[in-house]
A protein has these predicted regions:
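Flexible, glycine/charged-enriched surface loops at secondary-structure junctions
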Residues: 39-43, 200-209
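Structural signal for hydrophobic packing residues in well-ordered secondary-structure cores
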Residues: 14, 28-38, 53, 154, ...
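Residue-level signature of catalytic and energy-coupling elements of molecular machines
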Residues: 27, 88, 133, 210
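Translation machinery proteins
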Residues: 24-86, 107, 113
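Generic N-terminal amphipathic, Lys/Arg-enriched alpha-helix
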Residues: 1-17
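Ordered, amphipathic secondary-structure segments that act as subunit-interaction surfaces
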Residues: 74, 79-93, 99-100, 123-124
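Long, charge-patterned amphipathic alpha-helical coiled-coil/hairpin "stalk" segments used as oligomerization
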Residues: 93-201
Length: 210
């Protein structure tokens, strides 16, 4: 099998053995030694969970605020009215509205990374499932994007958070920062992701989980 030049350089990193298992701190230290590319790469971790995603009571989904952030600028849209809309604006949401935001989305507008809605606004948002679902933008209580506490949700989204969801193979892929972050920042982000996954373990899941 032919290997890319980048792969060969990575294998040649001092102290790295592709056949060996490493602890989290050691793995992060090695990751930062790998030759990079011309942009600030995202560090991502993958977990194989001991769940059966075919069973509705074994879905794993959630979100967690990352203490060191994500290193990305996030555009937040909020569907709310009244006091909740004012709270969202004060918290720094990029787009805030009610029927007007919903109508914009219906017309194809998706110039945002996270959509937050109050519970009473979901009657307007639910019909947008076909447009929002494929991009993972549909608000969901499990990820904290359907909430009355819109101010907190906006601030958390702006500060940096990671969403996770097990796929059909029970795998979860979660970004936990940029390679430009120092090792302690990446480790702190990694640790809170693991804690969140443990808390999200379905009660019906048996045996080894992570």
């Amino acid at each position: 099998m032919r290997r890319s030049k980048l792969y060969k350089k990575q294998v040649e990193v001092e102290g790295f053995d592709p056949q060996q298992r490493y602890g989290v701190a050691e793995a992060i230290a090695l990751l930062k030694k790998f030759p990079g590319v011309k942009f600030d790469q995202t560090a991502e971790v993958a977990f194989k969970l001991g769940v059966d995603p075919r069973k509705s009571d074994q879905t794993v989904r959630g979100a967690v605020a990352l203490p060191a952030g994500t290193g990305k600028s996030v555009r937040v849209a909020v569907v709310a009215d009244g006091a909740a809309a004012a709270e969202a604006k004060e918290a720094g949401a990029d787009f805030v509205g009610f029927e007007d935001v919903v109508e914009k989305i219906k017309s194809g507008w998706q110039d945002f990374d996270i959509l937050i809605a109050t519970p009473d606004a979901m009657r307007l948002v639910r019909p947008l499932g076909r447009q929002l679902g494929p991009r993972g933008l549909m608000p969901n209580p499990k990820t904290g994007t359907v909430t009355d506490q819109v101010g907190n949700a906006v601030r958390e989204a702006k500060a940096g958070r990671a969403e996770f969801r097990a796929d059909r193979g029970a795998c979860v892929h979660v970004p936990f920062g940029k390679l430009s972050f120092d090792e302690n920042a990446l480790k702190s982000n990694f640790d809170v992701i693991v804690d969140a996954l443990v808390k999200a373990k379905p009660q019906t899941a048996k045996g080894a989980y992570i």
